[in-house]
A protein has these predicted regions:
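Sec-dependent N-terminal signal peptides of Gram-negative exported proteins
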Residues: 1-9, 15-24
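Intrinsically disordered, low-complexity N-terminal regions enriched in serine/proline/glycine
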Residues: 5, 50, 84-86
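Residue-identity detector for glutamine
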Residues: 7, 37, 48, 52, ...
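Short linear sequence elements within intrinsically disordered, low-complexity coil regions
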Residues: 11, 52, 56, 90-92
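Short, surface-exposed beta-edge/turn micro-motifs
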Residues: 13-16, 33, 48, 82
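N-terminal secretory signal peptides
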Residues: 21-69, 74
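Mature, soluble, non-transmembrane domains
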Residues: 73-134
Length: 134
């Protein structure tokens, strides 16, 4: 497997690292936060989630969806701002995130951190697993 590594240092906090494991290899990103974005396969509407990398796992801090439709009803307490429904999901920290990669949807996943975005799961392959790097 190939290893692609992006490092960044900061005086304000010690960065943690996430690893995205796919059939293509391992993408390692040193970061304390990231955004996942994808397009809903039926409604063709963008969806975004903001995640924090913490010792307890991945914490979903905010989500946004640009509209509503089949299976995309805004959550209770969602606020419509600039064409996006913003809300804070109430889920416990996750030890890993598993992203489907069918290659049959409108787009793959976009993982953004540290001002750079990476396309994942644009072709049919095994699910992509995002974990904290050891």
């Amino acid at each position: 497997m190939a290893l692609v590594e992006y490092q960044r240092t900061t005086d304000e906090s010690r960065l943690m690292a996430l690893c995205a494991l796919s059939a293509a290899g391992v993408l390692r990103i040193a970061t304390t936060s990231f955004m996942l974005q994808w397009t809903h396969s039926v409604e063709k509407i963008p969806w975004q989630e903001d995640w924090q990398v913490t010792p307890a796992g991945f914490v979903l801090t905010q989500a946004r969806v640009q509209g509503s439709g089949a299976g995309m009803e805004p959550s209770e307490g969602a606020v419509l701002r600039d064409g996006w429904y913003h809300y804070v999901p109430k889920i416990p920290p996750r030890q890993e995130l598993v992203l489907a990669a069918s290659g049959e949807t409108v787009s793959g996943w976009k993982l953004c951190a540290n001002g750079q975005c990476h396309e994942l799961g644009t072709t049919a392959e095994q699910p992509i697993k995002i974990t904290q790097c050891q």
